[in-house]
């Protein structure tokens, strides 16, 4: 991509090509593309690309009805332009002529002008035959999920359709109030003064969590730059609460990026000695930014959680460890819809193996009577309850501790997407017995 402002539709198509053909994530591609876009076009590109990922099978089925010969090689970008055009026509309030013309004109910008007529013809044929085409397509279009994931969810959850429906919805915006500055009630009042509607209707939520009825830019949040609030899903906010760090304790936040959990730990225990670890240096930039905004201090380190000896002195042990383990992220598909197409069935066993290695390595660095909170944003038992059962079976010095979710007790807790308005999360809390 060239470093100049260009068509938002062309950029959206190029991003989708990277997702579908090269396995890149939207969370990486969109920030990288922002320098090529006018600021006003960034939300449009986000809406188009995230939206396409949510409903991809339906759009692909429509293209199959309209294009007799698959678009391959260089023309794959034309295929992605058609995805952009169809998404606009079906799901966005953009005038039809503008939706079509912008995509057709983009063929020239991406040096595929020879496909201009085909692109125009396909989109206009869809408009003429939309009712007939959708009647055919929608007989078979149902879950908008890859077959391997549908099968996994069917085996575990009787309400698998509800889960997938939830995955296809737009996620709400949750914030975490920094109680070092004000109470959640007072912050809700500040939002109310700005005519921002909020809710926190479920009892099974951290007290710091507030849901905004309509998403809001962070620069519009009261005193955001001064650290009064952080954007974080309500179920993710249980991580630090369950850890229950105390001032003076030695704490490890493993897999810490982008820093929401690290900062929450320090909001609750400002004098705790926290090491924030992540394997990617580039991801630690966000951790440092979040710490600075909130005026908090942690020891930020780049390292592999499976090999603590490479980033930690041999005699250092932790009172508490928060392990938000690498996972399939199947609980946050509504926030990252590209996950459906980036993950493969074979990834799950590899992730389970990695989680087990990290658990084992970090367990040796936990003090006797110390606690470890294991968390994932997955809804697959292999990464969650099965992983924990296998671990405590293999480690006689590990025991599960009952957790309290505002009066709802559990020794292992699986939140599903949309439950309480939150993302899918799993939690288990382990104590290391002094043997």
UniProtKB/Swiss-Prot annotation:
Quote the cellular component terms of the Gene Ontology held in the record: cytosol
- Pfam families named in the record: Methyltr_RsmB-F, NusB, RsmF-B_ferredox
**Catalysed transformations (reactions):** cytidine(967) in 16S rRNA + S-adenosyl-L-methionine = 5-methylcytidine(967) in 16S rRNA + S-adenosyl-L-homocysteine + H(+)
| UniProt signal peptide | none
What EC number(s) is this enzyme filed under?
2.1.1.176
> What is the first-listed, main subcellular location in coarse terms?
cytoplasm
Tell me which domain of life the UniProt entry assigns to the organism this sequence originates from: Bacteria
Instruction: Tell me the CDD domains matching this sequence.
Output: AdoMet_MTases (cd02440)
List UniProt keywords, sorted A-Z. Cytoplasm, Methyltransferase, Ribosome biogenesis, RNA-binding, rRNA processing, S-adenosyl-L-methionine, Transferase
Bilayer-spanning residue ranges:
none
Q: Where in the cell is it found?
A: Cytoplasm
The enzyme's first-digit EC class, named in words, is transferase
Residues that bind S-adenosyl-L-methionine, according to the entry? 255-261, 278, 304, 324
Question: What PROSITE patterns does the record point to?
Answer: NOL1_NOP2_SUN, SAM_MT_RSMB_NOP
**Active site (UniProt):** 377 (nucleophile)
Which GO molecular function annotations are given, in alphabetical order? Answer: RNA binding; rRNA (cytosine-C5-)-methyltransferase activity
Provide a GO biological process annotation: regulation of DNA-templated transcription
Q: Family membership, please give it.
A: Belongs to the class I-like SAM-binding methyltransferase superfamily. RsmB/NOP family.
Tell me, in a sentence or two, what this protein's role is: Specifically methylates the cytosine at position 967 (m5C967) of 16S rRNA.
Instruction: Provide the protein name.
Output: Ribosomal RNA small subunit methyltransferase B
Originating species: Haemophilus ducreyi (strain 35000HP / ATCC 700724)
What high-level taxonomic lineage is stated for the organism?
Bacteria, Pseudomonadati, Pseudomonadota, Gammaproteobacteria, Pasteurellales
């Amino acid at each position: 991509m060239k470093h100049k402002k260009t068509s938002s539709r062309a950029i959206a198509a190029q991003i989708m090509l990277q997702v579908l053909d090269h396995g890149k994530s939207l969370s990486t591609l969109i920030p990288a593309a922002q320098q090529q876009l006018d600021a006003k076009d960034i939300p449009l590109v986000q809406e188009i690309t995230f939206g396409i990922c949510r409903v991809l099978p339906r759009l692909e089925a429509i293209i199959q009805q309209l294009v007799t010969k698959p678009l391959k090689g260089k023309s794959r970008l034309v295929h992605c332009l058609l995805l952009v055009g169809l998404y606009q026509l079906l799901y966005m309030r953009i005038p039809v002529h503008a939706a079509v013309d912008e995509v057709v004109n983009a063929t020239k910008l991406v040096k595929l002008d020879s496909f201009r007529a085909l692109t125009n013809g396909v989109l206009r044929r869809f408009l003429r035959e939309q009712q007939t085409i959708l009647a055919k397509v929608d007989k078979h279009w149902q879950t908008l999920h890859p077959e391997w994931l549908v099968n996994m969810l069917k085996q575990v959850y009787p309400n698998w359709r509800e889960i997938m429906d939830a995955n296809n919805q737009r996620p709400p915006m949750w914030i975490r109030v920094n109680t070092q500055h004000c109470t959640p009630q007072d912050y809700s009042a500040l939002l109310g003064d700005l005519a921002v509607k909020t809710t926190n209707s479920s009892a099974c939520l951290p007290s710091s969590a507030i849901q905004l009825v309509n998403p809001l830019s962070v620069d519009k949040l009261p005193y955001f730059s001064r650290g009064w609030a952080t954007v974080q899903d309500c179920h993710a906010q249980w991580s630090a609460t369950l850890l229950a760090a105390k001032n003076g304790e030695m704490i490890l936040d493993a897999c810490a990026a982008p820093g929401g959990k690290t900062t929450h730990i320090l909001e609750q225990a400002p004098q705790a000695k926290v090491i924030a670890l992540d394997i990617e240096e580039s991801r630690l930039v966000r951790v440092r930014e979040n710490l600075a905004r909130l005026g908090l201090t942690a020891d930020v380190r780049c390292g592999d959680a499976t090999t603590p000896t490479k980033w930690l002195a041999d005699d250092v042990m932790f009172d508490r460890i928060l392990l938000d383990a690498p996972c399939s992220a199947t609980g946050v598909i509504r926030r990252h819809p590209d996950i459906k197409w980036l993950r493969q069935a074979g990834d799950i066993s590899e992730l389970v193996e990695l989680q087990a290695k990290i658990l084992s390595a970090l367990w040796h660095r936990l003090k006797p009577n110390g606690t470890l909170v294991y968390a994932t944003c997955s809804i697959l038992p292999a990464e969650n309850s099965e992983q924990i059962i296998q671990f405590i079976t293999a480690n006689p010095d590990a025991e599960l501790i009952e957790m309290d979710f505002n009066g709802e007790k559990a020794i292992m807790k699986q939140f599903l997407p949309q439950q309480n308005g939150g993302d899918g999360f799993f939690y288990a809390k382990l104590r290391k017995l002094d043997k």
